[in-house]
Amino acid sequence: MKVVVGMSGGVDSSVTALLLKQQGYEVTGLFMKNWEDDDDDEYCSTRQDLVDVASVCDVIGIDLEVVNFSAEYKDRVFADFLREYEAGRTPNPDILCNSEIKFRCFLDHAMQLGAERIATGHYAQVREWINDGRSEFQLLKAEDGTKDQSYFLYRLNQAQLAKTLFPLGGLYKREVRKIAEAAGLHVATKKDSTGICFIGERPFREFLMRYLPTKPGEIRCLDDDRVLGEHQGLMYHTIGQRKGLHIGGIKGNQDEAGEHEAWYVAKKDVKANVLYVVQGHDHPALLKDRLLATDLNWIAGRDPRTHWVYTAKPRYRTADMPCEIDALGEGRAEIAFATPQWALTPGQSVVVYESKVCLGGGVIV
């Protein structure tokens, strides 16, 4: 069986290709170039990543293909990213990149190369099972809970999962590095990439200012509406943000120890261009026990059961929280949590699970 592996130059995708080759698959590596604006930028690692991929493919003994999806990325991912920030929301472009680029453009290209499956270095698992006499594919959490990436894959569908392999889903990160080291892959100790793929390690505000001009407005206290300062643009702030407000010297509420409590972003009024803040991490305005989600994707192709207790992540790297789902139709649902959740953020994704199975999710309104 021919498998095309999406390779980034990191240890995860490198070991993915290695394991599949060892298992007898006909493997081809494919390097995707998804961003061109910063080819000569100090933060851009694309050239070195391609060098690393070529070296790994040479050691493993597989062919390498290079494809440029920059135009598709700008149209399907980056344009949405800018629209969301302009609207005062906080999007997660990595989720859209997965569904639109890595598991659509890449998948289509791999099929044109004659592949029967694609594979990536994501920490997740795919399971095929028979439901009412029909074959169905489930997305499961990875064995390594600290690296699980199912949250970022919730927008995948049955057709995409049916063609996808996740060889690292049953492994721990330390095992992956050991496998790479034993095989003589120089990327065994390479640092994991962080941040949004097209931003890399650069300061986020600096990057965003290149595409969205500053739009100063007032910072107001949500409790008494007094003006506390000025912001340079609502897009530079997110719900629950504490740092970078430049109002720390303004006193107000005190905690039990007599210390003045920190200010947190609680609300954005896009029409008035006002940023509202509150004092104290546990201020009631930062705690909500329900949310409205839209643009829903249920991996099985059907709504989950109503009045059934599931769990959900309202952001990445948070614990799964018990909840109930009320499907409202037209791609919307209300999710009610058993306990109040902190800083629910419009634009972020809420992802629903039943035990280890990722059911899907949507975007917080």
UniProtKB/Swiss-Prot annotation:
The active site is at C97 (nucleophile), C197 (cysteine persulfide intermediate). Its main location: cytoplasm. Residues 147-149, 315-316 are annotated as: Interaction with tRNA. One of its GO terms (biological process) is tRNA wobble position uridine thiolation. It holds the Pfam family tRNA_Me_trans_M. GO terms for molecular function: ATP binding; tRNA binding; tRNA-uridine 2-sulfurtransferase activity. ATP binds at G6, M7, S8, G9, G10, V11, D12, S13, M32, G121. Residues 92-94 are annotated as: Interaction with target base in tRNA. It is found in: Cytoplasm. Keywords: ATP-binding, Cytoplasm, Disulfide bond, Nucleotide-binding, RNA-binding, Transferase, tRNA processing, tRNA-binding. Disulfide bonds join C97-C197. It comes from the Bacteria. Belongs to the MnmA/TRMU family. This is tRNA-specific 2-thiouridylase MnmA. The lineage of its organism: Bacteria, Pseudomonadati, Pseudomonadota, Betaproteobacteria, Rhodocyclales.
